[in-house]
From Swiss-Prot:
Gene, per the UniProt record: MNS4
GO biological process: carbohydrate metabolic process; endoplasmic reticulum mannose trimming; protein glycosylation
Keyword line: Endoplasmic reticulum, Glycoprotein, Hydrolase, Membrane, Metal-binding, Signal-anchor, Transmembrane, Transmembrane helix
SUPFAM superfamilies assigned to the protein according to its UniProt record, in alphabetical order: Seven-hairpin glycosidases
Name used for this protein in its record: Alpha-mannosidase I MNS4
Cofactor(s) needed by this chain: Ca(2+)
Domain of life of the native organism: Eukaryota
GO-annotated cellular components: endoplasmic reticulum; endoplasmic reticulum membrane; endoplasmic reticulum quality control compartment
Function: Can convert Man(9)GlcNAc(2) and Man(8)GlcNAc(2) into N-glycans with a terminal alpha-1,6-linked Man residue in the C-branch. Functions in the formation of unique N-glycan structures that are specifically recognized by components of the endoplasmic reticulum-associated degradation (ERAD) machinery, which leads to the degradation of misfolded glycoproteins. Most likely generates N-glycan signal on misfolded glycoproteins that is subsequently recognized by OS9. Required for ERAD of the heavily glycosylated and misfolded BRI1 variants BRI1-5 and BRI1-9.
Transmembrane segments: 8-28
Molecular function GO labels: alpha-mannosidase activity; calcium ion binding; mannosyl-oligosaccharide 1,2-alpha-mannosidase activity
């Protein structure tokens, strides 16, 4: 069969996977219209407050809510985790009263001088990120949520917390330990094994903290960790899942875009966009190109050996679902659409995405049947709708809402699903449900009704952290100085005389030099005209950050990739009748299950497409 014809056929089949927006037993659902989008947005707002009020009334100040029993539990450090994680969602929803009262309570009551051993990764993305995002909102008139009485209390807490985590970075490789005691540092018996995501997903929060405090140490240690991981990449430019932070040896060489690695890729691109640091862009471009070359089995992604590219794990895991959203940010929208289509078909089959779905057996992976309210697929849906305005993503959003409302809602919040096939509930609600899951759902529908929210129509462009926290691209954070103390690093603002000359200020009238030891924002015009080169072209306008795929490796001595012969199975959700659509390009027909027979990872034109009749008549999905 002609290779061009095969790829055309493949593209047509993929475009049809989204055709199955079904209600009950094959009854077709109408596409979401503006009035319904507004109703869904309001419903999601109600979902947030059902869970937030449940936490505040039954669990606060413990870390997280047990929504079935209406009790609380300390799961991370015992410092009101869910409240901190929810702060910028409250601001996004325009809830000035609760945002203000929450910030004031945290500023007066929270402390980190506690004998608790915590995850460096989770504490950074949830607590440090939550504090920094809320600080940037509460201290800025332009956000519309400034708190008049606020005096940088959250920033003080953020710096205190980050300093308590610095001992974790004291390793020969620069890659941090996975855990640290907030009072005593790293325990002598602490494991030396950490995940790639755990060590390489700190640059946004630590970098922002350096910009706000004028102390480069936080940005330096986070960047050194990324360098330490990237320096140990394979000849194929792939990284493994787990590494020894002392020896630099990979203890798990499975490369992928999901569990244990996912946000490493995410923060490479986002750190460049936020800070304008081109070293991050270079690493991202090389890492992304290799991921697409060796991990991508269009539209799915597999795990391979980082040295040989041999497939070791033909499984879709739910953490991979962030990838289409990252691709949108990178300007690679077409493969993002195809992959999101495939991932969403798993949700349609079960009503949720299991932690693992085996692509060879077309079944939930053993031991990975749960859905812990993860946001990644919803996040990618938001980004794809923002990029395309295709109403199919609103339809997907409606399915998400229905699944959560009818399958996960509990007396005091929303429950984990322990088994996506039986829809069993578990008495736990992660803080990220309020930080991310409902946030992205609300943004999706708000965008459909000409939103006026902080993110889409606010004073700044925002980067979302991997925990969904809002980090603004502002001159204070994003502009690099012309003279830096280390390559690619933040240049501290220590030339007071130069700044005063440029800004026309008199140092003798500086009444604030001893009041507060943190960075005061300078006028934007002064920075751009006098001290800094200004926002980069990418920061201003955005463009594709993706490099073309390499056809020949630059080093001829590098080992050739060896790929095991195996079938990668592409599933659809359900066979449905033709769906009427007003929008151009929305067609529907019976959806086959598709398989790609294994071949060389570099010779996709040699792959065969096989079409099979769907044999699953009892696939479960929630629809409104």
């Amino acid at each position: 069969m002609d290779s061009n014809f095969k790829w055309l056929l493949f593209a047509i089949l993929i475009s049809l996977t989204f055709s199955g927006f079904v209600l009950h037993h094959g009854v077709l659902a109408e596409s979401v219209k503006p009035d319904e989008a507004k109703q869904l947005r309001d419903e999601v707002r109600g979902m947030f407050y059902h869970a937030f009020d449940g936490y505040m009334n039954n669990a606060f100040p413990l870390d997280e809510l047990r929504p079935l029993s209406c009790q609380g539990e300390d799961t991370l450090g015992g410092y009101a985790l869910t409240l901190i994680d929810s702060l910028d969602t409250l601001a996004l929803l325009g809830d000035r009263e609760r945002f203000t009262s929450s910030v004031e309570w945290i500023g007066k009551n929270l402390q980190f001088n506690i004998n608790k051993t915590v995850s460096v990764f989770e504490t950074t993305i949830r607590v440090l990120g939550g504090l920094l995002s809320a600080h940037l909102i509460a201290s800025d008139y332009a956000t519309g949520m400034r708190i008049p009485s606020y005096n940088n209390e959250l920033l003080v807490l953020a710096e205190n917390l980050a300093r308590r985590m610095l001992p974790a970075f004291d390793t020969p490789t620069g890659i941090p330990f996975g855990s640290v005691n907030l009072m005593y540092g790293v325990d002598k018996h602490e494991s030396k094994i950490t995940s790639t995501a755990g060590g390489g997903t700190l640059s946004l929060e630590f970098g922002v903290l350096s910009r706000l405090t004028n102390d480069p140490v936080f940005e330096q240690v986070a960047k050194n960790a990324v360098r330490g991981l990237w320096a140990r990449r394979s000849n194929l430019d792939l990284v493994g899942a787990h590494i020894n932070v002392f020896t630099g040896e990979w203890t798990q060489k499975d490369a992928g875009i999901g569990t244990s690695i996912d946000s490493f890729y995410e923060y490479l691109l986002k750190a460049y966009i936020l800070f304008g640091d081109e070293e991050y862009l270079y690493i991202f471009q090389e890492a992304y190109r290799s991921a697409m070359q060796y991990l991508h089995k269009d539209p799915w992604y597999v795990e391979v050996n980082m040295d040989s590219a041999a497939i070791v794990w033909p499984v879709f895991n739910s953490l991979q679902a962030f990838w289409p959203g990252l691709q949108v940010l990178a300007g690679d929208v077409d493969p993002a659409i195809r992959t999101h289509t495939a991932f969403f078909s798993v949700w349609k089959r079960y009503g949720f995405t299991p932690e693992g779905f085996n692509l060879a057996t077309l079944s939930v992976q053993y031991g990975q049947k749960s859905y812990p309210l993860r946001p990644e697929l919803i996040e990618s849906t938001y980004w794809l709708y923002k990029a395309t305005r295709d109403p199919r993503y609103l339809d997907a959003g409606r399915d998400f809402v229905a699944s959560l409302q009818y399958g996960a809602k509990c007396p005091c919040g929303y429950c984990h699903i322990t088994d996506v096939e039986l829809h069993k509930q578990e008495d736990h609600m992660e803080s990220f449900f309020l930080a991310e899951t409902v946030k992205y759902l609300w943004l999706l529908f708000d965008l459909a009704v000409d939103s006026d929210n902080l993110v889409d129509n606010g004073p700044y462009k925002y980067i979302f952290s991997t925990e969904g926290h809002l980090l603004p691209i502002t001159p204070q954070i994003s502009l690099a100085r012309e003279h830096c103390s280390y390559f690619g690093g933040y240049c501290p603002s220590n030339s007071t005389k130069l700044e005063q000359e440029v800004l026309g200020e008199d140092s003798s009238n500086d009444d604030h030099s001893n009041d507060y030891p943190y960075h005061e924002s300078f006028p934007v015009t002064g920075l751009i005209k006098g001290l800094c080169p200004g926002l980069t072209h990418a920061q201003k306008y955005g463009f594709s950050y993706v490099l073309p795929e390499k056809t020949d490796r630059e080093d001829v001595n590098q080992p050739k990739p060896v790929v095991t012969s195996s079938s990668i199975v592409l599933i659809s959700d359900q066979t449905v009748e033709k769906r009427p659509q007003e929008e151009e390009g929305f067609t529907s027909q019976s959806e086959p299950i598709m398989t790609i027979s294994g071949g060389s990872s570099n010779d996709q034109t040699g792959q065969e497409l096989t079409l099979l009749e769907s044999e699953t008549d009892d696939q479960r999905s929630y629809s409104s």
